[in-house]
Amino acid sequence: MSPAGKGPAWRQPAILAAAGAAHALSFAPDPLPAWSLAPVQVIALAVAAHASLQAPSARRALARGWLFAMFSFSLGLYWLYVSMHDYGGLAAPLAAAGVLALSAFLALFPGLACAAARWLCPPHWDASPPARARRTLYTAATWAACWAALEWLRAVVLTGFPWLNIGYAHVDSPLAGWAPLLGVHGMALLAAFAAAALAGLWQSASGRIDSRQALAAGVALLLAGAGWLLGQFSWSRPEGKPLHLRLVQGNVEQSQKFDPALLETGLRRHLELASLPPRPGEPKPDLIILPETVLPVFQDQLPASVWDAWIEVARRADTRIAMGVPLHTQPDGATGHRYTNSVIGFDASTPVEQLRTGTTAMRYDKQHLVPWGEYVPPGFRWFVDMLDIPLGDFDRGAARQPSFDIAGQRIAFNICYEDLFGPGLLPALQDGPDGRPGATIMANVSNLGWFGNTWALRQHLQIGRLRTMETARPMVAATNTGITAAIDARGRVAAALPAGRAGVLPVAVQGMTGLTPYARFGDKPALALIGLLLIAAPALG
């Protein structure tokens, strides 16, 4: 019998709840230091692995995995309360209930993973020592494959919400070396294997560590070592000269951003920041990037004088400007209207009429829209109306859109949480069917002001770092309230502005070319490995 079954009835739920809360701390260095995130994640998840694998039934394993994940998601996503209550105007009990309801739904995926692993790998404590050692390896592989498979499902079901995928806890661990090959889901597989291997070291029948069960842990260490070696390899090469960018962080308070009475104040702040002269010795920017919805109304609702002012900024600085703006357009030959969350690019020669009609040559329309925030799922109009979300029903952008050609570099934009979905970024990095080369730099524009100065900002930066590791492309992030940053092609933060402050970040970004295996094949290799383990490991064990 497992020690998990001994002691008072409340002990195991309390341990799982505490482990789940600790697990939430492993995503982004706040409040824990960066070096501790990966060990905390593996140790906390090992508690869930041990408890679920020693459950008396698959149903009990589901309950244990769900409880662990419920506490992990509830704490890790607490910042959703801020958006719903502080800025959405939802009553505190309803906002808290919203966070708990979402966490309960998301926790079903880990719960089902634990149930599947328990069903495929029943406890084997009564087996002979050699058989127990062999089965520990296969059990760890099966449990990891189940967990990673459900992480992937969480990324695609109902448009997907893969925030807090366990792979993100390892951006500073040796497992990050696997990112260019297997992506975040492959890293999740390896992290889950390490946790299950750690759980397998504990021989519950005697309460002592059994060295004969260390095989899986040894394999986990070998995989970490291989990841470190892979991390020394350069998967891309420089192209052209570094691009000089100015990233603008306006820090407009979310409660004021969509207030019509304060529209001019926000516009003036961004104009002033964009117009700042370069510091002594600092080259002029090739491009000024401003955040998502820096103009909080549709472009055709602004007078021509506003666009004249922006064109004047571009003229004085002798540069181009890219900004996030909601667009209202009527495509040629179409009878309907189109509303998109977009990024537009322009310079001093761009006619004002193009800006007012949304027909600029450089334009990106957001593809992966936020449910309830940017589009209304069927039957949920009442919820969106209750939150009073502005600009809440957009059309989707095309799957592949042209990059912005700036001074010999090609920039692929994404908006808000689109960088959470790695496969969606890949078409822009690959050569097009027309022979057009892929992008050399990625750029994210966001407005995270909805979440205050919370963990969401650090978690989002962590997500961006992993995207650069997967693709070996640098990424810059221009955000309203933070964290505005430049990340190099190895996932290192080269420069960043403090959250919650207005300012500009001048950076030189070296564009890169060449495709990593992940950039070429996406999640397919990781999914193939997960599928192979799900078929082979239980049979061999």
Curated annotation (Swiss-Prot):
Record GO biological process: lipoprotein biosynthetic process
Pathway participation: Protein modification; lipoprotein biosynthesis (N-acyl transfer)
Residue ranges constituting the CN hydrolase domain according to the UniProt record: 248-511
Cellular component terms per the entry's GO annotation: plasma membrane
Subcellular location: Cell inner membrane
Keywords attached to this entry: Acyltransferase, Cell inner membrane, Cell membrane, Membrane, Transferase, Transmembrane, Transmembrane helix
Chief place where the protein resides: membrane
EC number, as in UniProt: 2.3.1.269
Membrane topology: Multi-pass membrane protein
Protein name per the record: Putative apolipoprotein N-acyltransferase
Source organism of the structure: Bordetella parapertussis (strain 12822 / ATCC BAA-587 / NCTC 13253)
